[in-house]
Amino acid sequence: MKTGLTLEQLAAEITRQQSAKEDYVVNTGNLRLESYGPDLTLRVLDSDGADRIEPLEIGDIAHRQIGTHLSIPAKYYERMRSEDAGLLAHNVNTWLERTPAQRMIRVLDGKVRAYLSNRYLRMDNYSIASAVLPILAEIPDVRIESCQITDSRMYIKAVNPRLQEDVTPGDTVQAGVVISNSEVGLGSVNIQPLIYRLVCSNGMVVNDAATKRNHIGRATDAEENFQLYSEKTLAADDHAFLLKVQDTVRAAAEEARFAQVVGMMREAAAIPMNTADVPGVVKLASRQFGLTDSEGEGILQHLIEGHDLSLYGLSNAVTRYSQDVSSYDRASDLEIIGYNILAMPRSVWSRLNQVSACLLYTSDA
């Protein structure tokens, strides 16, 4: 599992961001994208054309969301952004004027970090962390193995060492839980079981057993609310969800579900790979599960080093490789992909091995 912040560092950053962030609901007709050489800023204007707030820098996520909202193809948007910022500003401003709407812009440290629907429900990291951390502290011997806050998400990954089993003799796994949240529209609040493998500190996220809450609420009108402040009172259903979050975290990976996943791991350990063409199987599996060629090469290396040419070995190679990537977000994706590989239908696994064998036979011929 990729190392992130300490819990103290995470708490400090969440608290800092809670004070530093600002949210606004605006009419898109009052937005202007302006270029200064290669740099772009977003202005929020009043009816007289004066700035309501200081011009804002724009983050990568917000750029993608602006392009999506205005139906500008992503590749073309990025080409204009890198090669002709003035052309991008002209395109964006034209479509903002022609397609008026109300949008929420989320700002942190003077930069637009998200460009969202005015129905976006702000269930922020501070609220989630405040709900779950006291519950984690109640679990005897609980360990916070890793946590992080990125531009995209907050993650808290905890392990309950009192709930553990051996997949094979000496290969011990422990139950845990992953809490994640996105404040920028890239995902719901998620609470997912985690399987932590002691032998190599791998984490595998069980992707089909999540408690989640989407960030969809009532529409906020720009004429009534320009700047949105921290909500001291949440809607009743949001309070109910936070209670559900606490209950899920308190269970810290329910014992029956943990036993079920361990059973899947034991079964996968007995399912062999086509050893005549291990690189071919890895390449096909990489394509099947959205892995890049370079990721596949790293996974192949860990698979060979692990001396376990089975379905279980492949899933572990993926989660082990997650520790090598620089992006914490991508590392967390790989922890989910590792489980998806473990849980793939046996018909898909058989097909991957058969196709690999056929390709090897064809190349030899």
Role assignments for model-derived ranges:
Residues 72-99:
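Short, amphipathic alpha-helical segments
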Residues 91-231:
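Internal, hydrophobic cores of structured domains that mediate oligomerization or house catalytic pockets
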Residues 1-82, 164-363:
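Intrinsically disordered, low-complexity regions enriched in serine/threonine
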Residues 88, 154-158, 267, 271-275:
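Charge-rich, low-complexity amphipathic helices
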